[in-house]
């Protein structure tokens, strides 16, 4: 996922998970083949700010596709009940009970990232789901690999590889920004854990809580404010908030930079999917 600092009239500051490019490139798709843009549109993705990167394309700020993987995306159902509820993708993790192995391969700050990863694992495992998590020491063992790459400045923190595959495997890797100064020895462990837990949520099938109206958590209307189906499905999870806002959800599109452990609706959603 992509996260940025945004300011509006110097009144607020938030960090955005996904879907917002640097101003200079947010509307430029000149380098993207028209065939790719047409396929994105046909499968429900926004073409705002599509970015050509090594080996493929970054779409909606948080999804990476090669041309081949894009062609395999199937259009899923889009069931919207309200504006701020928990939603899942069409594909979920299968073969339960299952242990998802996570490796921290971030190139620096090993103690910080190991501690944050362990906190993420503890958060999920505390719920007693049939989907559990375990940290492993090598990428070869891992189902989800956390890596570092220079994603530029401007407050960009990271990007995930999307959502579960058609055969029920989690998306990998989660890429966090390794540009100098993005993360430091003084970075709060629990805040970093919230960032990683959010990305892990996507890899196991969680959409943004406010995917249909990101203005709710971001405070301003962004390009592609309603993320739509995005070719992966946006299915309401029964039992979660269907009539009022859910300000503390770990899957909101924007965060204020504080720790967000699972709130009651988050727990309901995860239990519905994986208990």
Q: What are these model-predicted stretches?
A:
Residues 111-134:
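Zn2+-dependent metallopeptidase catalytic core
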Residues 190, 195-265:
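The catalytic-center signature of Zn2+-dependent metalloproteases
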């Amino acid at each position: 996922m992509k996260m940025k600092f945004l300011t509006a009239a110097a009144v607020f500051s938030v960090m955005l998970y996904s879907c917002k490019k640097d101003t200079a490139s947010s509307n430029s798709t000149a380098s993207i083949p028209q065939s790719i843009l047409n396929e994105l549109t046909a499968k429900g993705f926004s073409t705002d700010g599509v970015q050509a990167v090594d080996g493929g394309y970054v779409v909606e700020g948080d999804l990476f596709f090669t041309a081949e993987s894009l062609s395999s995306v199937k259009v899923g159902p889009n069931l919207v009940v309200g504006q701020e509820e928990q939603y899942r993708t069409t594909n979920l993790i299968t073969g339960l009970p299952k242990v998802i192995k996570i490796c921290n391969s971030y190139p620096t700050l090993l103690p910080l990232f190991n501690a944050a990863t362990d906190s993420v694992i503890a958060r999920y495992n505390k719920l007693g789901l049939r989907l559990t998590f375990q940290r492993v020491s090598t990428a070869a063992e891992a189902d989800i690999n956390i890596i570092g790459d220079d994603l530029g400045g401007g407050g960009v923190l990271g990007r995930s590889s999307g959502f579960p595959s058609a055969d029920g495997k989690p998306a990998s890797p989660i890429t966090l920004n390794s540009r100098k100064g993005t993360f430091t020895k003084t970075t709060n462990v629990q805040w970093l854990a919230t960032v990683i837990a959010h990305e892990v949520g996507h890899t196991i099938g969680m959409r943004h809580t406010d995917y249909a109206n990101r203005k709710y958590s971001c405070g301003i209307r962004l390009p592609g404010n309603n993320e739509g189906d995005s070719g992966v499905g946006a299915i309401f999870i029964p039992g979660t908030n269907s009539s009022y806002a859910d300000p503390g959800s770990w899957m909101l599109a924007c965060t204020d930079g504080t720790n967000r452990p699972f709130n009651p609706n988050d727990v309901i959603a995860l239990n519905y999917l994986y208990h």
